[in-house]
Regions:
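Short structured motifs
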Residues: 12-18, 38, 67, 81, ...
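Glycine-rich, aromatic-bearing surface loops/beta-hairpins
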Residues: 121-174
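Structured domain cores in non-transmembrane regions
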Residues: 40-107
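N-terminal signal peptide c-region/cleavage motif recognized by signal peptidases
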Residues: 4-6
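A short, structured loop/turn motif at beta-sheet edges
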Residues: 19-26, 59-61, 87-90, 127-136
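Residue-level recognition of well-ordered beta-strand positions that form the cores
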Residues: 29-33, 53-57, 85, 138-142
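A beta-strand/beta-hairpin structural motif
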Residues: 28-33, 83-88, 99-100, 104-129
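N-terminal onset of structured domains
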Residues: 9-50, 59-63
Length: 174
């Protein structure tokens, strides 16, 4: 039992994820915890850029044999990627949204990770939300190991200290 709690303490986790109706659409609010291993923290402190991925997928669950067996069809999926790195000269942590290029500065790593883990008012595609029956929105987050600098990649790919991806978690509909 001790081993399983140690393993889960070193992986990312979705603390909460709620889908809220707003106007004619729906938004997602979620909170993700990012406990980093010492190896990942050291890399960040030494200026290595780390790319975080937040993945979302909307699934239509079609019952085949009642609740015992269901066919899942992915209707929509997307990914939001952020790069986090440390600037030694300014002693700031820089968090960049790789889609919009919007960047924010933080004086502490914990502040940057807290901001990274806060998903607020993420719009969901209305074209798939006309019939909410049997719809599941899943979310997970991890580190994109393929975005690491080339010399670091092989070691990171085989080391458990870099594999921190959370399991898929279903958001709650409100």
């Amino acid at each position: 039992m001790l081993f399983s709690s140690m393993v889960s303490a070193e992986t990312f986790s979705i603390q909460s994820a709620q889908i809220i109706p707003i106007g004619n659409g729906h938004i997602l609010n979620a909170e993700i915890k990012y406990p980093l291993t010492l190896r990942v923290k050291e890399a960040i402190e030494n200026g290595v850029p780390i790319t975080f991925s937040q993945q979302f997928r909307l699934i239509k669950s079609i019952p085949i044999l009642g609740k015992y067996w269901q066919w899942n069809e992915t209707l929509w999926s997307t990914e939001i990627r952020y790069k986090l790195h440390y600037h030694a000269l300014t002693q700031q942590y820089l968090l960049v949204d790789l889609d919009t290029r919007h960047q924010r500065n933080f004086s502490s790593l914990s502040g940057a990770l807290k901001a990274l883990g806060r998903i607020e008012k993420l719009s969901l595609p209305p074209k798939y939300l006309t019939d909410l029956d049997n719809l599941i929105l899943q979310i997970r987050s991890g580190i994109d190991l393929n975005a690491l600098p080339t010399p670091m990649r092989p070691g990171a790919l085989i080391s458990s200290k870099w594999h921190l991806t959370s399991p898929w978690v279903a958001a709650k509909w409100h």
